[in-house]
């Protein structure tokens, strides 16, 4: 495997490729070299976590020869070495009062980006939530829900003082767009329509989709209308991707207010800190943090990944068949999908609290300042739509281990988030209506 890599290839990229090839020990050796170079201290025992939540990154633990134990995490995003100058931004979050774990080492060189923290023995919030759901330990839910609610309230408290008008140049420079717009475009191929490039081209365009008993080509599937659990939706997949390529462009978002934010603070990037009498949520790995993040994007990743990605279907697709019954049938230009997915009590509470404690007051403040556009729900929906479709290849047999069941469910979930019902309603539409400022048209 090593013979296929050039000596000039960045160490972080080498480690990522080795892990993908199942060469865990060689990957650990490469990371040990990188960590030794960054810290100036030889790295000893190193363990890479086999982690279902780290979809575009690696993390693990390492013991340095001076006895210190560290937790490391790094991203290996396509194109990041060309676009990110300041990759880690924990200090700017701490300066604004956010609870954030500050790394003891940070390297921002292209292809060598890595964060190292003092090793904690706290658990990640994502793991605690998964255990509650897997064990159906609903008696533990109240404490975790309250911690999340406090965190949502605290995030808003520190966010609102940073709200300001946006400048196109400053907004466009923010790394958060790597999670959305940059995954929709192919700058090297300008003839590709925005929204159908980037990961969309890599994952979906021209590919075959196996959705339970149906097998459809992209050209067909992308133009179908969807009826999900009896609810007819307005858009096709192609329409959602191309609209996202317009509405999520940095210049299109710059006029709607910007804030200081983490940008990717879903619960796999959050510690459940029990060092104080009252448990607190502490974020880490602020790879996409900034001072000019569009206000309508800042908590989208947390809203999707903490709530709609569970249980199992996104992060553990091979287990999807244990929980879900999904049927798919095409009739003419319409795809009918029925499934039994629903929010667990824990995720339903998270959705309610995120709306009440964060989104509702933020949207109201944007409306008062005249920065909330009439089409804000389209921006919100399209960003939510991009979370599952762009973080992983949702095709069965694609790059991410998805099955015919999880693929059908995942695309139906994305459609429900991205498109309004034609006549009926659904849980997400009701939630959006509930957080809407009264003076704003839907």
Regions found by a protein language model. Name each.
Residues 23, 36-65:
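ATP-binding glycine-rich phosphate-binding loop
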Residues 56-84:
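ATP-binding glycine-rich loop module of kinase domains
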Residues 73-112, 139-151:
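A conserved alpha-helical element in kinase catalytic cores
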Residues 93, 281, 289, 293-366, ...:
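Active-site activation/catalytic loop segments of kinase-like enzymes and analogous catalytic loops
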Residues 115-123:
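Short pocket-lining segment of the protein kinase catalytic domain that shapes the ATP-binding cleft
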Residues 128-262, 273-279:
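ATP-dependent phospho-/nucleotidyl transfer catalytic cores
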Residues 264, 269:
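Conserved catalytic-loop position in the HRD/HxD motif
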Residues 344-442:
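ATP/Mg2+ or Mg2+-diphosphate-binding catalytic cores
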């Amino acid at each position: 495997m090593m013979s296929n890599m050039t000596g000039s290839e960045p160490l972080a990229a080498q480690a990522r490729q080795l892990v993908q090839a199942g060469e865990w020990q060689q990957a650990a050796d490469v990371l040990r070299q990188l960590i030794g170079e960054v810290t100036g201290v030889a790295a000893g025992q190193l363990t890479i976590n086999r982690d279902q939540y780290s979809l575009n990154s690696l993390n693990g633990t390492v013991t340095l020869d001076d006895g210190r134990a560290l937790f490391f995490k790094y991203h290996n995003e396509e194109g990041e070495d060309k676009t990110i100058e300041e990759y880690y931004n924990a200090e700017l979050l701490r300066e604004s009062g956010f609870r954030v774990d500050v790394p003891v080492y940070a390297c921002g060189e292209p292809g060598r980006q890595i964060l190292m923290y003092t090793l904690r023995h706290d658990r990640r919030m994502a793991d605690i939530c998964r255990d509650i759901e897997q064990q159906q330990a609903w008696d533990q839910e109240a404490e975790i829900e309250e911690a999340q609610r406090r965190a949502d309230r605290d995030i808003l408290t520190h966010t609102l003082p940073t709200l300001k008008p946006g400048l196109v140049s400053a907004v466009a420079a923010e790394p958060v767009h790597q999670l959305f717009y940059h995954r929709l475009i192919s700058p090297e191929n300008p003839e590709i329509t925005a929204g159908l490039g980037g990961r969309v081209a890599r994952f979906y365009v021209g590919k075959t989709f196996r959705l339970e008993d149906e097998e459809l080509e992209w050209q067909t599937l992308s133009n179908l209308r969807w009826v999900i659990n009896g609810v007819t939706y307005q858009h096709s997949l192609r329409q959602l991707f191309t609209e996202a390529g317009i509405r999520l462009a940095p210049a299109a978002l710059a006029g709607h207010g910007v804030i200081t934010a983490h940008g990717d603070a879903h619960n796999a990037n959050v510690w459940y800190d029990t060092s104080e009498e009252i448990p607190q949520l502490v974020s880490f790995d602020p790879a996409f943090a900034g001072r000019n993040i569009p206000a309508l994007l800042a908590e989208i990743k947390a809203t999707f990944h903490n709530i709609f990605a569970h249980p199992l279907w996104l992060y553990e697709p091979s287990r999807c068949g244990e929980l879900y019954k999904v049927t798919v049938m095409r009739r003419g230009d319409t795809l009918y999908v029925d499934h039994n997915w629903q929010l667990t009590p824990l995720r339903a509470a998270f959705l309610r609290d995120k709306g009440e404690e964060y989104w509702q007051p933020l949207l109201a403040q944007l409306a008062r300042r005249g920065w909330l556009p009439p089409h804000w729900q389209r921006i919100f929906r399209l960003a939510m739509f991009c979370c599952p479709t762009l973080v992983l290849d949702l095709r069965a047999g694609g790059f991410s281990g998805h099955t015919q069941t999880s693929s059908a469910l995942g695309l139906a979930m994305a459609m429900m988030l991205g498109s309004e019902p034609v006549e009926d309603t659904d849980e997400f539409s009701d939630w959006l209506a509930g957080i809407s400022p009264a003076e704003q048209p839907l």
